[in-house]
């Protein structure tokens, strides 16, 4: 779909929608003291408001690097987004019934946004997903389709054949009928026919956010309009503080089917009624410098990336790429999704300091799909803070500073949680831990989702937890059990790892992220630390992605041997562990989630079945 930013129709003002009779209508958000508070009770209402107040303002600019390596800009205004979403909504109701799910399987682009907004306008439940690639994510997408059982799939003409072939097989296991597949760009989105926004329902549920599933199969988190709007308000308040300037022009390459990509790229611009500049994840991976260039050229104020995105930007952005560009206006770059590496943040700020990027713009943030996306970050105007904790003390659940930085776990602070209520809890006794003691992070607030789709047992266990003997001023429940391990140290939150990902080697607990951080100081690329069983206990195995650099086979063999020795020595020195096997593989070999997190359980299976193609086999 090639959009034309000059295409507008004057004089059309949407009317206030009537509540439907299906699900309970979403209630307005009341009682907030934030300057970002809003009375709109659904995302559909917010889109209608943006279209009414700023019809001619650019809403989304998508930079298409496939059409033109220099970047071809496609633009839609708020009026266009609302109008096209209404046309999609009318099409959906030809086939849909109240409460139906509508999956979105489309390439990153404006059509994805129109599809998502169309589902919300129709009062149906959106299920944002990636396009199936018949690769490592096949079963995960199939699992989400079987679980959500959509009646309709929205896609685009460029991939409709692939999606139409794929969908029946993905849904067949449940015995459900194949969903109807609709190409959004094949609809008459420029139609001038009269549209009635009051005909559609306003149910409480907005969409299902399927988790990235680093430790289990993806699960659909049920998120209400209230959850999403609340979290937007929390996020903006914490990132912007008391500033009168709301962040304009988000720049994002994060996939729309990921929680932060959806929030930053689609929803937050709608709430701010401003313009988002977007590109595809593939465009970023092909040339990471594009991200920094867009931040500078569009005077962006807010963006986001996981840890690996920062690494790629550092390694693959040259001074020539940044010639004449300035990043002084960038106020917030959120980093999360995977554990934040302190060394990565240091390299990033040092690399782009000559282009006026302030270190206070880097905002390590904690969140999860079960809490919509965002839970905590340090206050604005502060550079990232880290503390070096003693490895051995952490392994027994105590957070104590180490005097020797080389012998400790350097963890980044996520500040004192303000948006949500957070407690550190012993997962066995369900009692609150004192400050300085590691435990499971429990979260409470209106941003916490309603549960897992069609999984009441797991919903009860995860979203309905109750504290035993809560401290004064702390409610008994319900609480969200995050599955993340953390500690409150000197009044601030630090994340130590995942409960299910703790490595037990020789009877002692070890955080895999700490071991991986040690290795990355040597290798710089993606790495995964896993524990695999042997005859008596579990042994430590590390899998490291490396690019070939030796000019000859002999040079490459010597390099691989050197890396093996350095990795084994560093882990022994820092963690007092012996590595049973150091596996070196080509980039892209380690299985990851859709958000870039390493999948440890899948890595264990591949290792045990000898499925890694080892570069070190010849060394």
UniProtKB/Swiss-Prot annotation:
It catalyses: 17-(4-hydroxyphenyl)heptadecanoate + holo-[(phenol)carboxyphthiodiolenone synthase] + ATP = 17-(4-hydroxyphenyl)heptadecanoyl-[(phenol)carboxyphthiodiolenone synthase] + AMP + diphosphate; 19-(4-hydroxyphenyl)nonadecanoate + holo-[(phenol)carboxyphthiodiolenone synthase] + ATP = 19-(4-hydroxyphenyl)nonadecanoyl-[(phenol)carboxyphthiodiolenone synthase] + AMP + diphosphate. Pathway: Lipid metabolism; fatty acid biosynthesis. GO terms for cellular component: plasma membrane. One of its GO terms (biological process) is Actinobacterium-type cell wall biogenesis. Pfam families: AMP-binding, AMP-dom_DIP2-like. Coiled coil: none annotated. Its EC number is 6.2.1.51. The keyword Nucleotide-binding applies. The keyword Iron-sulfur does not apply. Keywords: ATP-binding, Fatty acid metabolism, Ligase, Lipid metabolism, Nucleotide-binding. One of its GO terms (molecular function) is ligase activity. NCBIfam families: PRK05850.1. Catalyzes the activation of long-chain fatty acids as acyl-adenylates (acyl-AMP), which are then transferred to the multifunctional polyketide synthase PpsA for further chain extension. Involved in the biosynthesis of phenolphthiocerol, which is an important intermediate in the biosynthesis of phenolic glycolipid (PGL), also called mycosid B. Belongs to the ATP-dependent AMP-binding enzyme family. This is 4-hydroxyphenylalkanoate adenylyltransferase. It comes from Mycobacterium bovis (strain ATCC BAA-935 / AF2122/97).
